[in-house]
Amino acid sequence: MKYDHQSIEIKWQRTWEESGAFHCDHHSDKPKYYVLEMFPYPSGNIHMGHVRNYSIGDVVARFKRMQGFNVLHPMGWDAFGLPAENAAIKHGTHPAKWTFSNIDNMRTQLRRLGYSYDWRRELATCTPEYYRWEQQFFLRFFEKGLVYRKQAPQNWCPKCHTVLANEQVIEGLCWRCDSAVEQKNLTQWFLRITDYAEELLADLDKLEAGWPERVVSMQRNWIGKSIGAEIVFPLEGPGGSGNDDSITVFTTRQDTVFGATFMSLAPEHPLVEQLIDGKPEAPAVRAFVERIRNMDRIVRQSDDLEKEGVFTGAYCVNPFTGRRMPIWVANFVLAEYGTGAVMAVPAHDQRDFEFARKYDLPMQVVIQPEGDALDTAAMQAAWTEAGLLVNSGEFDGLPNEAAKQKIADSLETSGKGRRTVNYRLRDWNISRQRYWGAPIPVVYCDACGVVAEKDENLPVLLPLEVRTHEDGRSPLPDTPEFAECACPKCGGKARRETDTMDTFVESSWYFARYTSASKDDGAFDPAALKYWMPVDQYIGGVEHAILHLLYSRFFVKALRDCGYMDLDEPFANLLTQGMVLKEGAKMSKSKGNVVDPTEMIARYGADTVRLFCLFAAPPERDFDWSDSGIEGSYRFIGRIWRLAEELSGVLLPVKACSATAADAATPQGKDLRNKEHATVRKAGADISDRFQFNTAIAAVMELVNALYLAKDELSGDEGGRKVLSSAVATVLTLLSPITPHIAEELWASIGNAGRITDEPWPQWSEEALARDEETIVVQINGKLRGRVSVPAGADAKAIEAAALSEPNVARHLEDVTVRKVVVIPGKLVNVVVG
């Protein structure tokens, strides 16, 4: 009978769905296992990256279920955001209609791949049933002081018509549309992620065992902890006298403060306008600031950047030396790092050195190597190594590391500064000036000011009866039914906040909502949340290392502190899968190299597509899609089908690894049983310990080869039939997490009761792996000429002697010259003749 993948796969998908095969709840005595792939944005169609990601997750889910775990494996939709809104505008439809139509299509595609999701837990973040709880979180954060509103320069995407968080600006471009990001002063809502900077950093130690080192390192660098000091530099007032105004700098090199000869400010520093007010330098400074503010942040931090600046006409005073220090605005100083002001020490900082050389600014050596003296006139680069302090008053002669502590002590006792810790991490701007997002539950009242909504008024519904603007501007400010409201505090006229929340807010807690997705009287069922969380295995792309993963970690900690959960980290283990490439490049419509999963499923079947995605490479590595590769996977599935057909009158309905030593009485039986148990051991270890699905599949392929070699010799007696049946059952059981449909079909066709989905993972035995003898393949010039049995562990000489005396081999060696004999113990002998 021909392998009809279409009807077979649909039949079993329907069977699983109707029987609730993958339903789970938290009322179980089994150990729990929560496996989750990052949920998709409903773009309309799944792509091969989705297939690989979700196939990896499905193997893990099915494997853990076979190991006896109570497995939670849900799916949902990251449904708010710019892409849906922009696509809907482009196609002349409403974002809601566009989104839900895409969800329906993608759900059908995912079902067609046979993934073991508990679809009862499906959620979409754009529904009021979901975002009402997000609005409630906002209110709790507001009460706790974790959310606040301020005006500040923001990253503005002119194409998307919205602000971007720092993490959403990639090399100066919008992460969504690649437009150049501009700076714009706006009043926005922020979450105080910086309140958790130290905990976010410290808890990375807990994740090192289960997360890729690369991701942990990326988060450490993004949080960017620096231990140093703040130093206050008084501003020089009119006539050279000091006044109460000052510039505070953060530095990790307080040991160099005696060498600070000028001050560098970021173009965005709030003091710039004050310093240049009424000065002749003002026009040049303003022009410079305008030009630099929109430069790429990454470029501005580059060592290769040409250092540029402009003098403000103002001065400050070095609090240790009394030196009059000119204040410059420099392109390499960033407002978001430290205080946005840098004490310039050109003799000991390379950027300052280049800047000072360019603008002929003074240098002062304050650290030099022991036994040597540095001359600023002769220096070709800054001295940035360790050394002894000079020209540093009472600290002269101290090693610079020791001087750091002494000078920090002096700062604090003199009131000139203080020890402090600085973080690169900045608070999370969650305001977005677009329509398709969760409304921020705040109103503005002339009498009461900024007022948070009441819980009983949630959800603040996103109105669906609006007309979106073609240029992407939000229609909410122009929708009176939404924007005009009553003040929750005084009942008077008020106006709603018309910004919506960053969609990364939705994805920062969805994993917890899955534990009780249908609960309508609270965000979470406490018992279910406690049982299922944290996620045991999270799977997704490394591109989310900072944005989504860092935000989710913060959100869990903030929700914990608001009493929603007793949890520190959301994801115990993380797997970052590689990309699926075509012809060495990322698949994209513009490149014309997209492989459509729907087309591949129709042609080859879901099992084949799954198999190829899992076999092509280890999961963390990229792999190149190839037609020959998927053809090879299709042939392998066909080979299993034919094997079952050829043995249809021979196979018995038995469990995997059920053949006994007595059944395997012949050498061929012993070899096959040994191979069966060795395969179970290897496949189990490869999947469980390393997620090396490709090598597990390769091991099963070897077992199939062994079955083809042994089937004729073992089909004739009862013991041989049991050995064959056990090995075939093992092949199907090992493949059931990978190619579940054909495994179910053949399992049933053999006459087994129940579904293979419900079978336990096979157990190998030491007894079956122990061998008295082993079979050695004998080749002459690479061609198979015979097999010999030798005692297990025989040495190379004994194996060679047995091979050369094998009758068929000996006959082929008559009248030829043996050049070389290659012996691979336990496997083969190759005789080279010529």
UniProtKB/Swiss-Prot annotation:
Domain of life of the organism encoding this protein: Bacteria
InterPro entries from the UniProt entry: aa-tRNA-synth_I_CS (IPR001412), aa-tRNA-synth_Ia (IPR002300), Leu-tRNA-ligase (IPR002302), Leu_tRNA-synth_edit (IPR025709), M/V/L/I-tRNA-synth_anticd-bd (IPR013155), Methionyl/Leucyl_tRNA_Synth (IPR015413), Rossmann-like_a/b/a_fold (IPR014729), tRNAsynth_Ia_anticodon-bd (IPR009080)
Location of this chain's protein in the cell: Cytoplasm
Main location: cytoplasm
Motif 'KMSKS' region per record, residues: 586-590
Keywords: Aminoacyl-tRNA synthetase, ATP-binding, Cytoplasm, Ligase, Nucleotide-binding, Protein biosynthesis
EC number: 6.1.1.4
GO terms assigned for molecular function: aminoacyl-tRNA deacylase activity; ATP binding; leucine-tRNA ligase activity
A Gene Ontology biological process term: leucyl-tRNA aminoacylation
Cited SUPFAM superfamilies: Anticodon-binding domain of a subclass of class I aminoacyl-tRNA synthetases, Nucleotidylyl transferase, ValRS/IleRS/LeuRS editing domain
Motif 'HIGH' region boundaries: 40-50
GO CC annotation terms, alphabetical: cytosol
PROSITE patterns tied to this protein: AA_TRNA_LIGASE_I
Binding sites annotated in the UniProt record for ATP: K589
EC supergroup of this enzyme: ligase
Catalytic activity annotation: tRNA(Leu) + L-leucine + ATP = L-leucyl-tRNA(Leu) + AMP + diphosphate
NCBIfam families reported for this sequence: leuS_bact
Family per similarity comment: Belongs to the class-I aminoacyl-tRNA synthetase family.
Protein name as it appears in the record: Leucine--tRNA ligase
Originating organism: Nitratidesulfovibrio vulgaris (strain DSM 19637 / Miyazaki F) (Desulfovibrio vulgaris)
